[in-house]
């Protein structure tokens, strides 16, 4: 059957027609992107998508939403849309829908993703296991964390708020970074470090620690400077970012009993070429008595262009697997 897959973020909403059957996503059509600010509601964007397609839309929707999906009224920063889950079927004139958190969608996507879209970062270069737990984390605007449980030919996605656990420094410089950030945030969660804005937090902390004058840069400019090696302090911040990402990826794998780890998120794709040469692996495996265990865990990175759309469709297919 056909469904409409939708990935809704703060500034953009992406639409695609997907075909699902027997719990699988058979195909995902061409993506259409709308700016949310140019459409007063999801309903109007839905109608615009139908007009662009030039035919009636399927009466089923799979929606990935960049925020919590529990509650009677859902809102996002930088997005004028308001979602009321109880009235979605009526507003969109559909029969069924699935509404999930955007990072939950990424976890669903991993369950359906071809291995060619998973780049090897470290550990054994082998396919993701067909049984067991896969830890999934993704730095973006924040830090998304989920885990994927595969068992007896089925899978289950468990969404978490793991991005909000405490940042744990592992050397003296990180002690100083934490102390500096506590002056601003009081409580420093790991997403204050491992996220798009996190690089700026590290950068400013390092400048203060070293007594180096610096100019406040927007995130895009800072990431560009760090990745292109145009600023020593930005490079140092990126090195610290990768160290911390490795540490928390390992911690989460231990906590979740994972047999493999997958990194997603917009930032993950940016640092794909940098990670293998960074201190990521050293921090990932350095877990004391469990170092040998950690060295046997494969770590992959998602390169699929739109995991949110694929994951939304996959979530629908998983829920309505009996529908042909």
Swiss-Prot record:
Entry-linked SUPFAM superfamilies: Actin-like ATPase domain
Catalytic activity: D-glucose + ATP = D-glucose 6-phosphate + ADP + H(+)
Enzyme class per UniProt: transferase
Secretion signal span: none
EC number assigned by the record: 2.7.1.2
Positions with a binding annotation for ATP: 6-11
Record-level GO BP terms: glycolytic process
Keyword Cell cycle: no
Keyword set, alphabetical order: ATP-binding, Cytoplasm, Glycolysis, Kinase, Nucleotide-binding, Transferase
Cellular compartment(s): Cytoplasm
Disulfide topology: none
Family label: Belongs to the bacterial glucokinase family.
Protein name per Swiss-Prot or TrEMBL: Glucokinase
Gene transcribed to yield this protein: glk
């Amino acid at each position: 059957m056909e469904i409409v897959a939708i990935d809704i973020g703060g500034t953009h909403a992406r639409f695609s027609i997907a075909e699902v059957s027997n719990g699988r996503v058979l195909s995902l059509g061409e993506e259409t992107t709308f700016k949310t600010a140019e459409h007063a509601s999801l309903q109007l964007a839905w109608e615009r998508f139908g007009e662009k397609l030039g035919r009636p839309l399927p009466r089923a929707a799979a929606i990935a939403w960049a925020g919590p999906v529990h509650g009677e009224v859902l809102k996002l920063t930088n997005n004028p849309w308001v979602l009321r889950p109880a009235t979605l079927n009526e507003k969109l004139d559909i029969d069924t829908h699935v509404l999930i958190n955007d990072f939950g969608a990424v976890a669903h996507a991993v369950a359906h993703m071809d291995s060619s879209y998973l780049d090897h970062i470290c550990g054994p270069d082998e396919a993701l296991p067909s049984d067991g737990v896969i830890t999934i984390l993704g730095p973006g605007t924040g830090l998304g964390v989920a885990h994927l449980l595969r068992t007896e030919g089925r899978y289950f996605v468990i969404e978490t708020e793991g991005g909000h656990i405490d940042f744990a420094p592992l050397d003296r410089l990180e002690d100083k970074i934490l102390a500096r950030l506590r002056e601003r945030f009081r409580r420093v969660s790991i997403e204050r470090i491992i996220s798009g804005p996190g690089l700026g937090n590290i950068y400013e902390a390092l400048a203060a620690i070293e007594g180096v004058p610096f100019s406040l840069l927007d995130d895009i400019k800072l990431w560009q400077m760090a990745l292109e090696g145009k600023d020593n302090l930005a490079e140092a911040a990126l090195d610290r970012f990768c160290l911390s990402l490795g540490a928390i990826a390992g911690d989460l794998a231990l906590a979740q009993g994972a047999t493999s780890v997958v990194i997603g998120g917009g930032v993950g794709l940016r640092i794909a070429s940098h990670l293998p040469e960074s201190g990521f692996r050293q921090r990932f495996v350095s877990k004391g008595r469990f170092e040998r265990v950690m060295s046997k865990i494969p770590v992959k990175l998602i390169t699929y262009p739109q995991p949110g759309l694929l994951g939304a469709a996959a979530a629908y297919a998983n829920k309505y697997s009996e529908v042909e």
